[in-house]
Design a protein with these regions (language model features):
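Membrane-proximal intracellular helices of multi-pass ion channels
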Residues: 1-447
Length: 447
């Protein structure tokens, strides 16, 4: 059955569309009275928005997760986060392996593309490592968080909250249950808690660097020279973005949102902002009061997002890195684009440029429409749309105030951000075979 669907739809289209059944089932379950603390039906649009946000591991919400949803509803959201983080095809493959069902070549190729692997050999082993590694990291995170949550909340509630937030952080989802302290407060209660901050940050970063990078590090340990070019670019770019982002927030918010904190607290909160604005959606400070510089820095980091083959969305670290490397290569007057003693093929540069243009166009267009419909300021709306496109989930507090039309636009942005801009074009576009005769070239003026 699956093999026939793959053959008919193609790998990219099948992987992208595999999120839709999860979203629809989640929407139905969240609509039910059993999911709502009021015991009433939740309207379809808000249930769909929550389902899309959870499955696309974003974290934008129209209701406070603790205040509105029952434990049943919260678990439905958590399952969608886990499926969205791993990918439905990874889950299906693991079930097939567990049931000892034969996985044919077409399904293996599909899994290769879904997991981000470059070779079909070893794809099933990689899938096992992905699932095993995910549960190990989430388990370690839950145990560590339990040491803080259990004394504060009691044993059962502490364990439940530890598991929920560990999974949400590792999958870069940003959903939280801290509304019992104050609705929509996220992790602001723990703003000066170094222990919780470091654990959440670590889970977000590990989940956001990608499964291929894990596998490469596991295989080659800490021998950087032996890593794949992909791994080298991801690690270096991630490190630069974390440090630069943290430094930026430290400077821009020193006398702003971080003014009442000690220097060590400022550093930790600035680093947390640098981590979470790229992929996760948690916040330890009030984002509605960010300075203009801090808001602009957040927009940039949100659009960049995490790394390919990870639980994160956005443009991806490698996309930005390739374009930056290409710019420097062009400035030097060279024809080849080289880095780490390897040459990057021109097709990758073209695809990277296309992806950036797609994201920028989508964010600008959707922001203009929402501004027109809602009458809100551009800064707030840009923040929201960039958060949706990067599947980040941080907000300046307008998500629950906007109309159904604007929610639909944000849902499209979240879905596109999760599967990738180029994949979205390939899903709904019709690829035509190349013409047998190439047209003559002609120069045009640019720049």
């Amino acid at each position: 059955m699956i093999s026939k669907l793959i053959s008919k739809l193609g790998y990219t289209r099948f992987i992208a569309l595999s999120f839709i059944p999860v979203i629809l089932l989640g929407t139905f379950l969240l609509c039910l009275p059993i999911s709502s603390k009021t015991g009433e039906w939740t309207n379809f649009t808000d249930s769909l928005f929550t389902s899309v946000s959870a499955t696309c591991v974003t974290g934008l919400i129209v209701f406070d997760t603790f205040t509105h949803w029952t434990v049943f509803g919260q678990i439905v959201i958590l399952i969608m986060i886990q499926i969205g983080g791993l990918g439905l095809m990874t889950i299906i493959t693991m079930i097939s392996i567990f049931l000892r069902k034969k996985i044919n070549m077409r399904e293996r190729k599909m899994m290769m593309q879904s997991s981000g692997n470059t070779q079909i050999d070893g794809t099933l082993k990689l899938v096992k490592k992905i699932v095993g590694g995910t549960f190990i990291f989430e388990g370690i995170g839950a145990v560590l968080l339990a040491f803080r949550f259990c004394p504060q909340m009691g044993m059962l509630k502490g364990i439940y909250y530890s598991c929920f937030h560990a999974i949400s952080a590792f999958c870069n989802a940003g959903f939280d249950l801290m509304g019992f302290r104050q609705p929509y407060s996220s992790l602001t209660y723990y703003t000066n808690d170094y222990y919780v901050n470091i654990i959440i940050m670590s889970l977000i970063v590990i989940g956001g660097i990608g499964f291929i990078v894990w596998n490469d590090i596991l295989k080659n340990k800490f021998h950087f020279s032996k890593y794949l070019l992909h791994t080298k670019i991801v690690l270096v770019t991630t490190a630069i973005l974390l440090v630069a982002g943290g430094l930026g927030f430290f400077i821009f918010e020193y006398n702003g949102e971080l003014a009442d904190k000690t220097v060590p607290q400022k550093i930790v909160n600035a680093m947390f902002m640098s981590v979470t604005t790229r992929t996760a959606g948690f916040n330890t400070i009030d984002l509605s009061n960010l300075s203009d510089s801090g808001t602009l820095l957040s927009l940039i980091l949100m659009l960049i997002g995490g790394s390919p083959g990870s639980t994160a969305g956005g443009l991806k670290t490698t996309t930005i890195a390739v374009v930056v490397i290409a710019v420097f290569a062009m400035a030097k007057g060279g024809d080849d684009i080289n880095t780490f003693k390897r040459r990057i093929v021109s097709d990758v540069v073209k695809q990277s440029a296309v992806i950036i243009l797609i994201y920028l166009f989508a964010v600008m267009l959707s922001s203009m429409i929402i501004c027109s419909v809602e009458g809100l300021g551009m800064s707030q709306v840009l923040f929201e749309t960039a958060s949706a496109a990067g599947t980040v989930g941080v907000s300046k507090g307008i998500t629950n105030q906007i109309s159904a039309i604007s929610k639909i636009i944000l849902m499209i942005m979240m879905y596109g951000g999760r599967i990738g801009g180029l994949s979205l074009v390939l899903v709904f576009g019709q690829r035509k075979p190349e013409a047998p005769v190439k047209r003559p070239t002609e120069q045009i003026l640019i720049g």
